[in-house]
Amino acid sequence: MRIALGIEYDGSKFYGWQRQAEVNSVQAELERALSIVANEPIEVQCAGRTDAGVHATGQVVHFDTNAVRKEGAWTLGVNVHLPDDIAVRWAMPVNDDFHARFSATARRYRYVIFNHNFRPGILRKGVSHYHGDIDVERMHDAAQALIGERDFTSFRAIGCQSNTPFRNVHKVSVSRHGMYIVVDIQANAFLHHMVRNIVGSLLEIGLGNQPLDWMATLLEAKDRSQAAATAKPHGLYLVDVTYPESFGLPKLSLGPLFMPD
């Protein structure tokens, strides 16, 4: 039997999603809890591997099991065995042709900036603090150059292992909510550090350090060294993964917190 789960987590205390020897990971904690409930070893596949310090409100995983359990066992039961900063939001059986990663048609991230002269005391691990006068409209306008299928070499990590630098960005917006700025971006998939590298460069435009057309210039350059420094991990959230409607997966509010969908 194949089961799909929707999970959320605060990535502050984890060395990323992926299971690694001798460090704490979201995958290892989830597999440990699932294995207890299933009474057999469980391995999970996820929609998107998040880095150290990065959060998720809409991560999707699947696993195969011989165990027959009520739906509540895969939600309430698993949550009992998870640390407080990981939670299962929903669970449902799926066909064997469903794959959390390969069946996905889009991923959506939100990057939350706390724009204030002083650092935050609350949510300090859930937002990234940047001071200065940030022009959100400039950031939004500049970001539109990213839409479409593009070569994102300038925005991929040096150690990125993807076979191709091309990704298709479906939509991107930058908006202000009081002291908070939200960069919201959806694409078919993302390169390693792609969102944080994009945000780092957009911030340079918002601060007036680079011209409005700089994002287009960076796309043409195809050179990571020409773009800005990688933005901090704390403000980044995987908020949604899109699948064909035929799979019938639940759609919940994106978040984080009270942010509208």
Curated annotation (Swiss-Prot):
Under InterPro entries, the record lists: PsdUridine_synth_cat_dom_sf, PsdUridine_synth_TruA, PsdUridine_synth_TruA_a/b_dom, PsdUridine_synth_TruA_C, TruA/RsuA/RluB/E/F_N
**UniProt keyword Isomerase present:** yes
- Source species of the chain: Shewanella amazonensis (strain ATCC BAA-1098 / SB2B)
Q: Which reaction does it catalyse?
A: uridine(38/39/40) in tRNA = pseudouridine(38/39/40) in tRNA
- EC annotation from Swiss-Prot or TrEMBL: 5.4.99.12
Q: Does the keyword Amino-acid biosynthesis apply?
A: no
Catalytic residues per the record? 51 (nucleophile)
Q: Name one GO molecular function term.
A: tRNA pseudouridine(38-40) synthase activity
User: Function of this protein?
Assistant: Formation of pseudouridine at positions 38, 39 and 40 in the anticodon stem and loop of transfer RNAs.
- Oligomeric state and partners? Homodimer.
Know the name of this protein? tRNA pseudouridine synthase A
